[in-house]
Structure formats: structure tokens, C-alpha cells
């Protein structure tokens, strides 16, 4: 019984240490790539690049969203059984502009949270 308790304590210490080290304990961050301006009625591609160190079944990005003027236009959900394909991955979304728009995106780590909301404004030419 003492051996099982000792193993459990050691395992918990290792997991705690791994999540305390910056290389392992990482918040999910996003970058938005899109044109600065587009013609009215033009379809544009918005690329969201997501980064998070150490995506694994315990510690991973669990969601990413993309909004246009506060309205969600895309959302990706992940879990321990459906992990992101890598520590850095991208998603593309097409959007037809009728007026200037403010694009926001955010991703979240299931243990450590988000690096915050990122914003990109797209003007009409």
C-alpha cells in the first residue's frame, strides 16, 4: 500500500512540475491573417493560426472561435479523444464583405486558458 501511495505522489509531482514549466504550461494563442481592405461584395479568406505547446490528452487546446462583428462565424472544438493536429495549426474561413468588419478570434487551453482575444479590422475599398 505504501508503494502505491508513493507512486501516486511521485506521479502527481511530475505532472505538476510539467505543467509549471513554461515549455509545458502554455496558453492557447491565435493570429488572424486577412487583407486590410476588400471591395464590397468580395469574398475574402481569413486564416486563423493557432499555437499551443504540448497538445496531448491531458493538456490541449479545447476550442477556437472566429467572430465577425461579434457574431460567431466559425468554431472548432477539441477533446482528449480529438486533439488538434499539431502544436501549430491553421483554419481558413471565407467571408463575403458587405461593409467594414471587425474580426476577432480566441483559443483556449483546457488547463491554462487563453492568451486573449485577437482583433483585425477589414475596411471596404
Where are each of the predicted segments found?
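N-terminal edge beta-strand
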Residues: 23-44
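Solvent-exposed serine/threonine-rich low-complexity stretches and specific carbohydrate-binding patches
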Residues: 72-83, 121
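Extracellular Ig-like/FN3 beta-sandwich strand-entry sites
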Residues: 43, 98-102
Amino acid at each position: 500500500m505504501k508503494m502505491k501511495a508513493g507512486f501516486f505522489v511521485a506521479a502527481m509531482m511530475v505532472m505538476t512540475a510539467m505543467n509549471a514549466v513554461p515549455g509545458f504550461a502554455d496558453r492557447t494563442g491565435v493570429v488572424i491573417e486577412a487583407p486590410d481592405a476588400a471591395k464590397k461584395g468580395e469574398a475574402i479568406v481569413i486564416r486563423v493560426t493557432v499555437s499551443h505547446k504540448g497538445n496531448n490528452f491531458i493538456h490541449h487546446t479545447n476550442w477556437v472561435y472566429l467572430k465577425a462583428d461579434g457574431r460567431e462565424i466559425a468554431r472548432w472544438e477539441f477533446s482528449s479523444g480529438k486533439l488538434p493536429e499539431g502544436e501549430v495549426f491553421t483554419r481558413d474561413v471565407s467571408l463575403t464583405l458587405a461593409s467594414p468588419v471587425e474580426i476577432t478570434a480566441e483559443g483556449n487551453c483546457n488547463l491554462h486558458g487563453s492568451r486573449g482575444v485577437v482583433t483585425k479590422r477589414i475596411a471596404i475599398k
